[in-house]
Amino acid sequence: MHVVSTKQMLNNAQRGGYAVPAFNIHNLETMQVVVETAANLHAPVIIAGTPGTFTHAGTENLLALVSAMAKQYHHPLAIHLDHHTKFDDIAQKVRSGVRSVMIDASHLPFAQNISRVKEVVDFCHRFDVSVEAELGQLGGQEDDVQVNEADAFYTNPAQAREFAEATGIDSLAVAIGTAHGMYASAPALDFSRLENIRQWVNLPLVLHGASGLSTKDIQQTIKLGICKINVATELKNAFSQALKNYLTEHPEATEPRDYLQSAKSAMRDVVSKVIADCGCEGRA
């Protein structure tokens, strides 16, 4: 097994009526939990990293780790650039071996978004790299980027078709009421908008900001065309809360291999639940 593109993963999900979870990883323990759990459940998963994650860990290190774990567990894995904005940064990582990219130019006016995305698509497709882009903009914070709720806006279904056709993207991230981070109360997702987008666009659709969504809402979005579910904050929260609890109960603890086990156990529960919600167990 080896590092693969997300294109076939998401096309399979679109045909099969399930979604592939993309887990944002932040350290070795997160990677171990995601891959081990996915392999045990025979579920396809995507290892995602923001620019900050790649800077923290190093592109070559992440690629080597994903490749080694794919071979160790005999499980296909995709490593994905999440919310990358700079062409030169994307190009460098693609040349290093990354095979899945999200170019996020959603903050730009429509025409400029198309232009920026098409530049990335034209480059990436030369290397058989799949490209995701976003139309509409989610509120909340992702990496170092903060989008105020007032500046967030939903995806326009008619524009979505024009955007997809003009850019040649392989998947489309949509804005239907989710946000980055956890929710103080359950969000009201615009399912009718999602259904309209699917009628206009015959591409795998992507849902960002899925941390904290109910199983019912996740499964409804999948019925309406979502093929990739992004989860980041829920993993971070599980990790940090379990770690805090352990160190509070065991203030004398100094061995990382001991106290990190509680954090891994908490994350394992999250990963298992997300895989179940996505309906992708046994699909790898």
From Swiss-Prot:
List keywords of the entry alphabetically: Galactitol metabolism, Lyase, Metal-binding, Zinc
Q: What is its EC number?
A: 4.1.2.40
The record ties this protein, via Pfam families, to:
F_bP_aldolase (PF01116)
Source organism superkingdom: Bacteria
Cofactor binding note: Binds 1 zinc ion per subunit.
Biological or metabolic pathway of the protein? Carbohydrate metabolism; D-tagatose 6-phosphate degradation; D-glyceraldehyde 3-phosphate and glycerone phosphate from D-tagatose 6-phosphate: step 2/2
- Cofactor(s) essential for the protein: Zn(2+)
Q: Name one GO molecular function term.
A: zinc ion binding
Reactions it catalyzes: D-tagatofuranose 1,6-bisphosphate = D-glyceraldehyde 3-phosphate + dihydroxyacetone phosphate
Question: Which amino acids does the record list as binding Zn(2+)?
Answer: 83, 180, 208
* Enzyme class, UniProt record, top EC level: lyase
The entry's function note states:
Catalytic subunit of the tagatose-1,6-bisphosphate aldolase GatYZ, which catalyzes the reversible aldol condensation of dihydroxyacetone phosphate (DHAP or glycerone-phosphate) with glyceraldehyde 3-phosphate (G3P) to produce tagatose 1,6-bisphosphate (TBP). Requires GatZ subunit for full activity and stability. Is involved in the catabolism of galactitol.
Q: How does it assemble?
A: Forms a complex with GatZ.
HAMAP family given in the database record:
TagBP_aldolase_GatY (MF_01294)
UniProt protein name = D-tagatose-1,6-bisphosphate aldolase subunit GatY
